[in-house]
Structure formats: C-alpha cells, structure tokens
Amino acid sequence: MVTPPPDIAAISALQTKLVSALRPILPEHALLWEPEDTIPYECDGLAAYRRMPLAVALPETEEQVAQILKICYAMQIPVVPRGSGTGLSGGAMPISQGLVLSLAKLKKILSIDPFTRTAVVQPGVRNLAISEAVAHLGLYYAPDPSSQIACSIGGNVNENSGGVHCLKYGLTLHNVLRVRGVLMNGEIVEFGSMAPDSPGLDLLAIVMGSEGMLAVVTEVTVKLVAKPKLARVIMASFDDIEKGGNAVAAIIAAGIIPAGLEMMDKATTRAVEEFVHAGYDLEAEAILLCESDGTPEEVAEEIARMTKVLEESGASGIQISKDESERLKFWSGRKNAFPAAGRIAADYYCMDGTIPRRHIATLLKRIQGMEKKYGLGCLNVFHAGDGNMHPLILFNGAD
C-alpha cells in the first residue's frame, strides 16, 4: 500500500488556524511556528527519529496550559508535552499535525518543607536543581538520571525516570507524593496526596511513565531524603564480560542492595576515560561500580561483603574510593557515557530496555556477536542492579 503524499495546503491552513487560536492567550515569544524556530523541537534524546510539529507553545502559567489544551481539544489537534527533551524513548517526539507543549518555562520551586521532607515544584525545574535547593538542609532528591543536570522533573514523571541510584532509592514513582495536571479538555486534576496511603485507586502510579498521554503535569510534590553520612564506591575490574554480568547476580543473591550498581564494557570505559579521566581500568573487559552509603559502620560492613562477593566472582582488580572526590570522579565517568559516545561517532542510537539480571552476561555476549555480524560498534552501559540496558549503537548517518 502506497502512502499518499501529505496535503501541504491543508497542513498549512491547519497551522494558520491553530496559531490564530493560540495567539490571544500566549505572548508572542511563547508561540513558535516558523521552521527555523521549531527545528529544536523535532526530536528528543532519541535523535534518530525526527518530525516537525505544526507549532510549539511555551506557556508560563497553569492557566495558559489549560487554555491551550481546551483549544486543541476543540480543534482535535494532538498535543505532545515536552520537558527538557533529554528522554531516550521518543516520548517527546512531535506529531506532524500536532502541537508540542513545552513546560520549560514553568520552572519555579514553589515550596520546601524540611519537616515533612517534601518540596513542591513546577514541571520545568531541573532534577539536579531540587537537590541544590535543599542541600543546605542536609537533604536531596534521590532519583538521578545521567541527564540530571538538564532533565526536568515533569519529564521525569512522564518517563518514570530512575538513575544510577534507583536500585536502592527507587524510580520517580517511589519518590513523588502528588502530581497536579491538566486533562486534554482543560480540566485541572490532582493525583496522589500527602497522606501515606490515600483511599481509592492508585491513579498516581498510572500517570507515572504515561508520557503525558493522560495529563499534562503542572506541579509535582517530591519526597526528599537525608544525605547519608558516608558513601564509598567499589570499582571492580573483570577480564571477562561474562564474569562481570554474573557478579551482578551474585551481589543481589547475597542479599546486598547497593546504593548504586552500574556496569560498563571495555569500549565504553575507553571512550569515557578519554573524555573525563575518571581513573578507569582500560585493560578490563568490563567494570562494575558498586556504591554503599549510610553510617560509617554500615558502609564498612557492606563494602567488605561486596568485596568478598566480587572476588569470588572472579574480579581481576578492586579499587575503593578513598574520599568523596574520588567517589564523584568514578561516577562522573558513568554519567558521561553518552557524551563520550558522541565524541567518537557521528551518530549513535541508544536503546533503553530491561532484562532479568540473570541474562545480563548472555545478552552482552550476543551483542558482541551482532557487532561483528553487522560491522557496527556498540558501547554497553547499564543500570546493572535492575537490568536496565543502554546499548549505544555507533554509526554515521551520512553513510
């Protein structure tokens, strides 16, 4: 079946109608429709797929969000909410005859309550900005995606984001108490509550990860946690990638829940080391980063237990961070894996999938086989603790 060509005249007329309807409710700078202005919104972090929207709206208030949605609902124009555009699953990719609704301008931290350990923020607030705002209170926001310096809390809700510490501290779902949002017809609703257990269906869990299809997020109440007194990281090297994968399963089987448990293969560690000089073992076929946090006594005990498991699993080298500076240096390598890939390849396609931990080693071997079969390089980095894989397939889109 041949797909008919798009009706350019009809699309142009629809765009004109939409822009005319939105102009009365938005400032001039908050409504974009010219191609040179909307190109930055043609994709999110999954840059292999691109599509131009009819227009981009950048509201500055919840009321404007509601008015925009009412207009689009009446005109039957699809709306794609967008945070910072760092997502890797195409959740903010536009619809060609739709509107991109950017929440980037709703970026206020509305309140911080150190007694209930909560903060109320708008969706455009950066993930890391929450922790920065409460650092003086000895608190922080636990979910820490690799893009936390740029990603927004609204986008985190839409994708149910995790991060390198999600094994112990959970995903966005486990760290948010309440979400306020707007339905497609403009109705303002709230999901969740400040109570430990609110009556009725758990609609908050349904909204998490829904990519804005159920409601456009306008306000989020997040949980804050106390900073641990101490944190240390083990960097374990393996001369065989299968041993590294099996070590992950062995740590969990031993009843240990590390604060972070990440794995990178040799290609990734080499790319990262050239970029940030994290001190990684460049001869290792795979490295594991295993973090323990808590009181000094708890950390010492857990580090000893993990070291024993790693040695029994065949680790060829073990290095424990000496201080906070070295701990952050170890993590900086993992968190810069994506930009490091961008330095060595013109393009890369990042996969984002989850497998049972027991299959990590097998899958890594399969990926190595496919690299040889198809002649494409691949950097493997993932949240080993929950089996969330991020293979970065390297290519040149110009070929």
List PLM regions with ranges:
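Feature of Fe-S/electron-transfer and energy-metabolism proteins
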Residues: 1-17, 36-40, 56-63, 70-74, ...
